[in-house]
Amino acid sequence: MKRKTVWKIWITLALIALLSITALAGCSSESSTTNKEDGAKSTETSAGTNTLEKIKKRGKLIVGVKYDLNLFGLKNPETGKVEGFDIDIAKGLAKKILGDENKIELKEVTSKTRIPMLNNGEIDAIIGTMTITEERKKEVDFSDVYFMAGQSLLVKKDSKINSVKDLKKGMTVLTAKGSTSAQNIRKVAPEVNVLEFENYAEAFTALKAGQGDALTTDNALLWGMAKQDPNYRVLDETFSKEPYGIGSAKETKNYCKSLTNT
């Protein structure tokens, strides 16, 4: 990837990061805005308040993040620290709630494990490139969109694949388990083989080992992979919209608002 392109990505992420902390005040949950009993609303408010009080009493915010996605959440092998856009948002929330961005514990999640970890109480929130979908809203309450991505393909620089339409029967596309990417690619390219891995780091390693013709996920994540290895390129084409939101446990619909109003 050209250096100029990389800088454009970082500038864009930096600008969004400045806006995200305040933008979260509009936590989206369509079902909570209409036809609610006063008692139900009171219960949701209480649940959100109790969650916030629990975090303050504990003295740290526990957030589920990705460890394998350059630009968003990647563990630095030299320092052992996790770095990226999602990490900066998590630290911003910790500072807003507890007055110190360092009062935070980052737990590794994958697309497959993040919702179960949230719902069993291991983490307070998910900030891990999670697309807001109607299906996920049944299990998770979401903040407003903090980043809009689109699904694309990562291929070798000399690959003849320049569009999703170039994916033919017999080809193999790699992705991660539990992701919307796996669902989407099966819809737009039903004849290809889809191999799902535990995380995107494993999928990228498999691509470099020749186990597939392309890797698919959101373009923002693919840019990070291409930045790591210049032998690969991201297609300009996208074939979905992937709005990222912060996830919190169900029945704490006012939790996100509480976080930003602290």
Swiss-Prot record:
Assigned keywords, A-Z: Amino-acid transport, Cell membrane, Lipoprotein, Membrane, Palmitate, Signal, Transport
Membrane found in the keyword field: yes
GO CC, any one term: plasma membrane
Residues with lipidation of kind N-palmitoyl cysteine: 27
Cell location: Cell membrane
Membrane topology: Lipid-anchor
Lipidated residues (S-diacylglycerol cysteine): 27
Pfam families the record matches: SBP_bac_3
Gene Ontology terms for molecular function: ligand-gated monoatomic ion channel activity
Signal peptide positions (record): 1-26
One of the GO biological process terms: amino acid transport
Domain of life: Bacteria
PROSITE patterns: PROKAR_LIPOPROTEIN, SBP_BACTERIAL_3
Function, in words: Involved in glutamine-transport system. Interacts with the glutamine-transport system GlnPQ.
Family, similarity comment: Belongs to the bacterial solute-binding protein 3 family.
PANTHER family associated with the record: ABC TRANSPORTER GLUTAMINE-BINDING PROTEIN GLNH, AMINO ACID ABC TRANSPORTER PERMEASE
Protein name per its UniProtKB record: Glutamine-binding protein
